[in-house]
Design a protein with these regions (language model features):
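Bacterial N-terminal signal peptides
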Residues: 30-41
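Surface-exposed, glycine-biased beta-strand/turn segments
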Residues: 127-238
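Short, well-structured beta-strand-loop connectors
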Residues: 216-227, 259-277
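Extended, charge-rich intrinsically disordered regulatory tails
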Residues: 272-284, 290-310
Length: 310
């Protein structure tokens, strides 16, 4: 166990305009026609933003994907999606298509979210119903020496930098792989008591795999290694750790490793060996903790494994 931490209304109107035409001055009639017609051309209604939200009815822990389709490529850099007081970047995923990823967590309340989508000089407010999800509760008794372990300043700094990383490129393609072949011992979102005390601001930020010590840990998707940390450097909680940036605000972290096979700056492919299962850091035994982050918040990686996030 670990102690760690998203109509087009195509209206066509026939505008009747009677402009006197003088046979003796064809040029004058053309000028008049242009003058009278100009205001009507300028007043033509703008096309509504085309927005697709998936899943349509998300539950807590899901990633909400908001895809915005544009008509004018010059406006792509101006697309944003706002949820509450948080504005998320929309990255290009196809010509004239941009996507923002909105994380939800077990610490939030279920209910209606109003998403403000802005682009091409227009704004749309969309209502999305986020469903409640019941998360299990565990009681963890940490052995002496583990219960009082605190992260070092360096560890906290590197972890915060990793979660805040934003890369415009999208490195992953298709569903994510399981990083280890062991059985899942702890699912995402579990609430916990530690040594009898409820951690009310805690939820299990990832999935634990009960892999055998030394068993392979592989990259679930393509990305760049942006974090390699070791116990000897002060990673008391994470243990030996690897962080991969999958691009566009999506990242994976792998904790408690016994061995690390990559270095910072390496680009890894899906299924590539990155380390081995261990029990370093704040762990009660050998296992792999896979944390999955979207725009800085821990979300459930299972939907990313089961289908392509649109």
């Amino acid at each position: 166990m670990t102690t760690e931490y998203y109509a087009r209304t195509c209206g066509k109107k026939l505008l009747g305009l009677v402009v006197p035409v003088f046979k003796t001055n064809v040029r004058a009639s053309s000028v008049l026609l242009g003058i009278f017609a100009l205001p009507f051309a300028l007043a033509a209604p703008a096309k509504a933003l085309q927005v697709e939200v998936n899943p349509a009815t998300p539950q807590l822990g899901d990633t909400i994907s908001v895809v915005v389709s544009l008509d004018n490529p010059a406006n792509g850099s101006n697309v944003t999606v706002t949820n509450g007081d948080q504005t998320y970047p929309a990255y290009e995923i196809a010509p004239l298509q941009y996507r923002a990823l909105i994380p939800t967590t077990p610490l939030e309340k279920a209910g209606t979210r109003t998403l403000r989508v802005a682009g091409e000089g227009q704004v749309q407010n969309l209502s999305v119903q986020v469903r409640q999800r019941k998360f299990p509760v565990q009681r963890i008794n940490l052995p002496p020496g583990k219960a009082g372990v605190e992260a070092t300043e360096y560890e906290l700094k590197r972890a915060a930098e990793f979660k805040a990383l934003q890369t415009p490129e999208k490195f992953w393609d298709g569903p994510f792989l399981a990083p280890n072949k062991g059985r899942v011992s702890t699912i995402y979102g579990v609430r916990r008591y530690y040594n009898g005390k409820f951690a009310d601001d805690y939820y299990h930020r990832g999935i634990d795999y009960a892999g055998a010590a030394g068993s392979p840990v592989v990259a679930p998707a393509a990305g760049r290694v942006v974090l390699v940390g070791k116990v000897s450097q002060g990673f008391r909680i994470h243990g030996n750790v690897v962080g991969i940036d999958h691009g566009q605000g999506v990242a994976s972290i792998f904790m408690h490793l016994s061995r690390i096979n990559v270095k910072e700056g390496d680009f890894v492919k899906p299924g590539q060996l990155i380390g081995a299962v261990g029990s370093t850091g704040a762990a009660t035994g050998p296992h792999l903790h896979w944390g999955f982050y979207v725009n800085g918040k821990s979300v459930d990686p299972v939907p990313w494994r089961n289908q392509v996030v649109k």
